[in-house]
Amino acid sequence: MSTKNGSVGILVANRNQRKFVLKQYLQSKTMHLKLFCFTPSSINWRRKRIIGLHRSNGRWVVGYFPFPQVIYNRCYDTDPQLIERLGAAIGVNKCFNHINQFSKQEIYTNLSKWLSDYLPATAPFDKENAVQLLKTHKDLYLKPCYGHQGKGVVRVEMQASGEIHISRHYFSPEIIFQDTQQFQESIQAILGSTPYIMQEGIPIQQVDDRIFDIRALVQKSENGLWSVTNLVSRIASKGSFNTSIYDKACLSQEILNRLYPPYKANRIIRSIYDVSLRSAEIMDENPDYHLGEFSVDFALGNDEHTWIIELNGKPQKTLYDGIRKQSVVYMRPMQYAQYLCTH
């Protein structure tokens, strides 16, 4: 099948992001692709042209482009109407990661059909059920249904005395309620009108007395099939439960090798690979999504069990900048874009 113009457009939120994002993908660009970066406001629908930034003869150049054959969406929380219009212009399933802001409740519902053993108890927030879950688990995380990077997350912990401690980002409490009645009377004012979920708190493994996560980056490659690109861990700042506030990022293998003998570390890694790929298969079953990549954040329980904490539809690529030999992180989306050009 012909590749037509073989062009790929990377959609970003604003003009200031164009050069930074494009530079990352040009370094590992697949052959025979013309790559440019554009924003929603740079589309001229009447003339069917796009103003985009590209690299030409060693220079950064802004120019006019026809609609590309494939669009890679790196614009978070994209307007659905924009995606629908782009799909009508370039063809069905030629824009990938068009939905990249996931509903945590919807993801939980989808994954729980097949992966319930790896999911903490999760439900839409309401005051009455929150108290029941607190009595059962003693530790809850309240999360915005559409949140990211730990923003808006509230940790709720019930003490043996009956006190309820409320904290954000760090374990130290910001607010202390004397009992469940005080909690129920006040928690909605803390959360506001944003829809929240509540998630069971898991007693998780630490390294150097710090929380860490394991992020599996799952990407499609030149054959359109899923694979796990790497596992990277963020080690949270001292006293923080939010790994988006981290002091160090490294390959997860390094941490697991410190905590466990090789056979246990390898068993944990195999489990994470298997669960991540199963998650990808489940996401592909939903016709509303067309993903070329996403990440799965895991927590490791004290009993060595792996728990899915959340899925991210716009993986943070700067996380990999200090990690050696990670150019494949940027290469894979271009390989998948080339696959879409020919299929």
Predicted features and spans:
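Conserved N-proximal alpha/beta basic substrate-recognition cap immediately N-terminal to
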Residues: R15-N129
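Residue-level signal for well-ordered, solvent-exposed loop/turn and beta-edge residues enriched
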Residues: R59, G224-L225, H305
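Rossmann-like NAD(P)H-binding beta-loop-alpha module
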Residues: D117-V154
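Phosphate-binding site of ATP-dependent enzymes
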Residues: K135-D139, Y146-G147, K151, M158-K248
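Active-site and channel-lining beta-strand-loop segments
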Residues: L217-V218, S295-G301
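C-terminal active-site "lid" helix and adjoining low-complexity regulatory extension at the edge
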Residues: Q253-G292, L300-H343
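Short, solvent-exposed loop/turn elements at beta->coil junctions and helix N-caps
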Residues: K127-E128, G201-Q205, S295-D297
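Extreme N-terminal starter segment of soluble prokaryotic enzymes
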Residues: S2-V8
